From Swiss-Prot:
PANTHER family: PROTEIN TYROSINE PHOSPHATASE 36E, ISOFORM A, RECEPTOR-TYPE TYROSINE-PROTEIN PHOSPHATASE. It catalyses: O-phospho-L-tyrosyl-[protein] + H2O = L-tyrosyl-[protein] + phosphate. Residues 30-309 form the Tyrosine-protein phosphatase domain. This is Tyrosine-protein phosphatase non-receptor type eak-6. GO terms for molecular function: phosphoprotein phosphatase activity. GO terms for cellular component: cytoplasm; plasma membrane. The active site is at residue 248. The keyword Glycosyltransferase does not apply. Disruption phenotype: Moderate increase in constitutive dauer larva formation at 27 degrees Celsius. Increases constitutive dauer larva formation at 25 degrees Celsius in akt-1 mg306, age-1 hx546 or pdk-1 sa709 mutant backgrounds. Normal lifespan. It comes from the Eukaryota. It comes from Caenorhabditis elegans.
């Protein structure tokens, strides 16, 4: 059974933060600050992008998106790709034991290298967050068989489809990659209805996300320590990460949105202590993948998904939203030109809400609501007693929990 108190705290924090951002109309300003902080961090840590800018590699990039050098996926050198370059980044989050490979759409001549990456990295899953064609623009070339009757070959890699399931917005395939006598199976999930120009509905996104859990292996493999295997075997490529591959048109914003949502849901499900600051995780993802800035709408979408996810787990929490709105109205307006004010929405330790003060106000509003309900049901003497309690409560009383009140 889930711990409702822990979920309740996360729900209250994110819901009121979302209310305050909307109230102050500062989505754009927050994202501007995130971009500035991310760029400063990039230059301070000297995160270069020279490998992707080399003459031999630049044609392998998608829409000009060039990845960082420090976390590139390196392939075994081949005659066609002597530098072993692929536009893909290993995004590791050791503090929570999670990792991903982020990459862009499969482009014709680069498809053999994509499957080389899948095979060498032993990736358990591919999450495809793009359509082949979006608003008349071709985004991805065909790189996998459509059904169990079809087989494809890219270079030395034979790709067969062992299972195929289609459910509204989801296509699932169990694919097998073969090189000689060696094989590797990978779960392929394709999401329909999420393009560069729109956002999916909560119901569609969660149907896709939950189906991934039901159909195959868990999307996320816990990070494995490759130090020992690397010690005993000299790899000519990045040692196998066993990381799932997250794929959108450029390996940018949609991948970032999906990863942040996936991380937060896993933190919630496993009751892991965390700041649960969406903006902090946006910065973390930006540090792993260049060109992964989110739009205001994508930023807000993450809030919408996580708030609704918690509310779905505990439907009674919906009653808190009106109280959180009431408290948000007592919080001073934010000066969007004041960098220090805006940064309070980004840095977890600088949050502007006094939780104790918020709890007292919500408790008082709930007490008054109960008092109003009881007015017609109690004697005059009881009403006097209840009112005296209310007077005392205004200075001293605080609810320990707001659910079921």
């Amino acid at each position: 059974m889930t711990n409702i108190r822990e979920d309740e705290n996360i729900f209250m924090f994110l819901c009121e933060k979302w209310i305050l951002i909307n109230k102050n109309h500062i989505w754009n300003r927050i994202n501007q600050r995130i971009n500035i902080i991310a760029d400063f961090d990039r230059y301070q840590r000297a995160r270069t992008i020279s490998e992707g800018q080399r003459t031999e590699n630049i044609h392998r990039n998608i829409y000009g998106a060039v990845p960082y050098d420090y976390n590139l996926v390196n392939l075994t050198s081949t005659q066609r790709n002597p530098l072993g370059y692929i536009n893909a980044s290993v995004a590791e989050f050791p503090e929570i034991g999670r990792h991903y490979i982020i990459t862009g759409a499969a482009q014709d001549t680069q498809i053999p290298f994509f499957w080389q990456m899948v095979f060498e990295q032993k990736s358990p899953a591919i999450v495809m967050l793009l359509e082949d064609v979006e608003l008349g623009i071709e985004k991805s070339d065909k790189y996998f068989p459509n059904n169990t009757r079809e087989e494809l070959k890219f270079g030395i890699y034979d790709i067969t489809c062992k299972e195929f399931v289609k459910r509204n917005i989801l296509e699932y395939r169990l694919l097998e990659v073969s090189v000689g006598n060696e094989t590797h199976q990978v779960h392929h999930y394709k999401f329909h209805g999420w393009t560069e120009f729109n956002l999916p509905k909560y119901e569609d996104f969660m149907a896709f996300y939950n189906t991934m859990k039901e159909v195959g292996v868990p999307l996320l493999a816990v990070m494995k320590n490759n130090c020992m295997s690397s010690f005993f075997k000299k790899y000519h490529h990045t040692p196998p990460t066993n990381a799932p591959i997250i794929q959108c048109s450029t390996g940018g914003a949609r991948c970032g949105v999906f990863i942040i949502i996936d991380i937060l849901i896993n933190l919630i499900d496993n009751r892991i202590k965390n700041s649960y600051s969406i903006e902090w995780w946006m910065l973390k993802v930006r540090s792993k993948r260049n060109h992964s800035a989110l739009t205001n709408q994508q930023h807000s979408f993450i809030y919408d998904i996580i708030i609704k996810y918690i509310r779905t787990r505990h439907n009674q929490l919906r009653h808190l939203e009106k109280y959180l709105e009431a408290h948000a109205n007592t919080v001073r307006m934010i000066d969007s030109t004041n960098t220090e004010d805006v940064d309070k929405f980004i840095k977890p330790r600088d949050w502007i809400v006094d939780f104790d003060e918020r709890d007292r106000l919500i408790g008082k509003l709930q007490f008054r609501k109960r008092l109003k309900i009881e007015k017609d049901q109690v004697s005059e003497q009881k009403l006097v007693h209840l009112k005296s309690q209310l007077h005392l409560f205004q200075d001293t009383y605080k609810y320990e929990s707001y659910v079921l009140q």
